[in-house]
């Protein structure tokens, strides 16, 4: 094992990378409330894992979506647990994100030179809420259907561009298969990818600038 490690160490300098990660200075004022962002990340990872597991059984069609969710809950081994953990971690992610925003705002973590870190955090907040909106519709039950109809109908009140925005969100004038397909694509591919990119940017900036000081 030693020779294998030495081979990789010679080429990748693993030890120097590990030393840089583990030797980062942590200010003495940091407490448990500074862990809220990390907890949000943990919830996101759980979301990805459990969501990926459910894609093996979920069918994104208006005729089969609800039945496939019922199948996951009743027939798939531990399917009820996987979906429940997905729902619980989704709620926890939103809660931790809100608390994290409050902590950053109250401690002045958004001030110079961390403005861009705050901007990426706000974008992550919007993406998190978008996860909730798109995921809520996927079972395609009465609650999900009417929630989508109401949410996608809100832009219709905007003059001139309202109707095109509604059609863009729904895929047509009315809510139907194209709407479910778009929401499924957003929920399982577009939003996770964007969230991963902005989380990486967010953490790299925190890594570069360090944790903000006390008030």
Swiss-Prot record:
Family classification: Belongs to the cytochrome b family. PetB subfamily.
CDD domains: Cytochrome_b_N
Name of this protein: Cytochrome b6
Membrane-spanning segments: 32-52, 90-110, 116-136, 186-206
Subunit structure comment from the entry: The 4 large subunits of the cytochrome b6-f complex are cytochrome b6, subunit IV (17 kDa polypeptide, PetD), cytochrome f and the Rieske protein, while the 4 small subunits are PetG, PetL, PetM and PetN. The complex functions as a dimer.
Cofactor (UniProt): heme b; heme c
Gene this chain is encoded by: petB
Coiled-coil ranges from the UniProt annotation: none
Function, in words: Component of the cytochrome b6-f complex, which mediates electron transfer between photosystem II (PSII) and photosystem I (PSI), cyclic electron flow around PSI, and state transitions.
Predominant place of localization: plastid
């Amino acid at each position: 094992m030693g020779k294998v490690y030495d081979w990789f160490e010679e080429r990748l300098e693993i030890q120097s990378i590990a030393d840089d990660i583990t030797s980062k200075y942590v200010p003495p004022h940091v407490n448990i409330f500074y862990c809220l962002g990390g907890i949000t990340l943990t919830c996101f990872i759980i979301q990805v894992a459990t969501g990926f597991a459910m894609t093996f059984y979920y069918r994104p069609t208006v005729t089969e979506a609800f039945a496939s969710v019922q199948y996951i809950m009743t027939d798939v081994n531990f399917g009820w647990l996987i979906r429940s953990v997905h729902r619980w971690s989704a709620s926890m992610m939103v809660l931790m994100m809100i608390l994290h925003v409050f902590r950053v705002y109250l401690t002045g973590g958004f001030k110079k030179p961390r403005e861009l870190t705050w901007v990426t955090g706000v974008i992550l907040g919007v993406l998190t809420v978008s996860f909730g909106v798109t995921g809520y519709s996927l079972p395609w039950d009465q609650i999900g259907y009417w929630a989508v109809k109401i949410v996608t109908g809100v832009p219709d009140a905007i003059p001139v561009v309202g109707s095109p925005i509604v059609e863009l969100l729904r895929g047509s004038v009315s809510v139907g298969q194209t709407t479910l397909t778009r929401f499924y694509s957003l929920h399982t591919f577009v939003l996770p990818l964007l969230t991963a990119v902005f989380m990486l940017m967010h953490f790299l900036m925190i890594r570069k600038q360090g944790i903000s000081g006390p008030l």
